Structures are given as C-alpha cells and as structure tokens.
Amino acid sequence: MKKKDRYTGHRYAKPNRSSENDIYSNSDRYARTTGNKKYKKRKKKWSAKKKIIVTLCIILGIILMIAGIVFAYIKATLSQLGRVPLPEAPETLGISSEVAEKYKDLDVTNIALFGVDSREDNDIGRSDALMILSIDRVHNKIKLTSIARDTYVTVDGYGQTKINHAYAYEGPELAIKTINENFDMNIQGFVTVNFSQLAEIIDYLGGINIAVTEEEREVANRLIQELGVQCEPITKSGESVHLTGDQAVIFARNRDTGGDSERTGRQRKVLSAMFDQAKAIDVTQYPGLINMVLSQSVTSLSDNDMLGIGTWAVTSGATMEQMSLPNENCNSSGEIIDGVWYYVYDLDLATDLLHDFIYEENSAD
C-alpha cells in the first residue's frame, strides 16, 4: 500500500529499508558511473607476498631491538675494564721491522697476560705470572705460553735483571717491550688480571678439577696452615682433584715444588681448568662471571677486539695448547748473580722454540 504525504496528499511507495541497509547488495544504487564504465567499492585484500614482507619487517625490527639491548649491555659491561692505551708505533714496543714484516699477514694475534697481586689501587705490583696468549685462527687453536718470572733478560733502561721486574718498574708497556725485544715477538696488546680476587672467581665457577701430585698436595696443605687461609685442606691427590678457589690459588702459588718452571706450569693448569669450567657453566651465569673478571682487569684492547676474540673463542671450537719457557730444550740453569737467583737459558734457542709453537713454522701446514 502506498503511503500518503500528509502535506501534499500524493501517495508514494515505501522503500525497502532492509535492502538499503546492505550497501553491497544495493551496490548498483550507489555505484559511480563514468561513461560506459561502472566502478564499485570493494574490500581491499592483502596479497600473500605483502603479508610475508610485513611479517619479515616485524621480525627484523624485533631482532634489531634485541640486538640493540644486548649491544648496550655489553658496552656497559666492558666499561668496567680499566683501560691503559699503548703506543701505536711498533718500534716503541720493541717490535723490529723484520718481525713485523715476517708475521704481518698471518692471522695470529699475540696478547701479553700479566697476573699481579696488587691489593692497593696505587700499587702496580710485579707480574706474578707472565704469559703469552696466542689466538691462532690459522690452525684454530688457543695457545698459552708461560715465561718463568725469574728469567734473566735485558730490560731497556735497567740492564739485566728478572723479566717480571719490568712490570714493576714502568708497568705493562715496558713489560711488553721486554718480551718483544728478548723473544723477537710482535705483541701489541695486554690484559692484566689482579690475582687477589682469583679465588672468588673460581668459587663462582663451582671450583675446578685439576691433576695434583702427592707432593703438591702436602706442600699446599702446609701453606694453607702457615698462611692461615680459611679453607679445608686438600684431601687427596690424583689426575682429577676438585679444588675450591682458595685451594687452587695456594696450589698455583706453590714455589717449593719443582722450581719456577713447575710453578708456571701449575698456573697454566689453573687457567686452563678455569677456561674449561667457564665453557661448562650455564649461560645464565655468564653475566656474573664477566662482571667479576672485568672488574679485576686492565687492558689495552678495544671493545671490538675483546668481542671479536671472545666470540671466536666460544664459537670456533678451538683447542688449547700450552708451553713453558724455559723447558728441557733451552739449556737452562739456575744461577746466582750478584747475590740474586736467576733462571739463565739460551734466549735464541728459546725464541726459536716459541715461534715454532705459536706459528707452527716447521709443521706440515
């Protein structure tokens, strides 16, 4: 029935409201016509390609955000390191032009490691442990060479004396120069670790497992008692003895068993065992370990150097090898000179042995 207009009296048909409310079923009524073409509104649909691109962008954004947080954390952590810059000129560090030229293209990085027991902030301390850490990417190895601290060498400006005196005289720069000049090395970086907190780091790792002879056990227990160290005695000897932090430090500092060469060997054993234990701990413990080590360390290495070496060491599956100087091939002897005991040996022969070990010059490779 047609509805009547109350003002004009005309009648008109009532529109179909239900169909008008559905804009798509009445699309012809709302379509825009231009010439002979009719354009209709329709929903936009994303293509599969566009969805993939958007998803990848979101994932990339999340990765970049996480990477930024991790990078900021690492930078903040590395800021705990004490920094001591070294001269950039190789000759200033005692590196000869011949040595620099010979090894410039080899992917082997040598870093001096100094262990000191300095309990005061202004105390440089003698290098109680002196080692060369070699990052050998050519043969995928980490090599650790310890040099006896009583080695008789020439120290620039001070004459002939013990090699560990160089660190006490003028710090790491002179110590590195002394190693380079006496062993034809090309060391341009160093890390110094304060041994005063070494026991705490080992305890954080859960202790270490190490070979201990019966003589070493007896001497260590005597030192524990004499020095009043608050720890349990070492109860057994053998190929794998579990040591706490204090026990391990006493073990490494034992000067009464086998002389200085065996003492440096014990120091290498402790460091090697710490390295193995550090790889075995849960990843959630790494931040605490890193904080403990860095807070007791000083270095000349940049953040990029540290990150590069650390990443390679963890991911490369590199094996660790060790050597000490002097050894049975160096014609070494203990001598008293001007009332002081020194390790005297053929430095030229020792240099050849050191280079063969680090660079594997005489290997089949």
Per-range role (PLM):
Residues 117-122, 161-169, 184-189, 253-262, ...:
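Second-shell loop/turn segments in exported
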Residues 2, 7, 43-139, 308-310, ...:
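Entry/capping segment at the start of metal-dependent catalytic domains
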Residues 165-232, 302:
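Amphipathic, coiled-coil-like alpha-helical scaffolding segments used for oligomerization/assembly
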Residues 94-101, 120, 151-155, 159, ...:
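C-terminal solvent-exposed extensions
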Residues 203-282, 364:
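Flexible, polar/acidic helix-loop-strand segments at domain edges
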Residues 123-127, 157, 166-174, 192-196, ...:
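Soluble non-cytosolic domains of exported or imported proteins
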Residues 106-109, 125-130, 137-147, 158, ...:
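Extracytoplasmic
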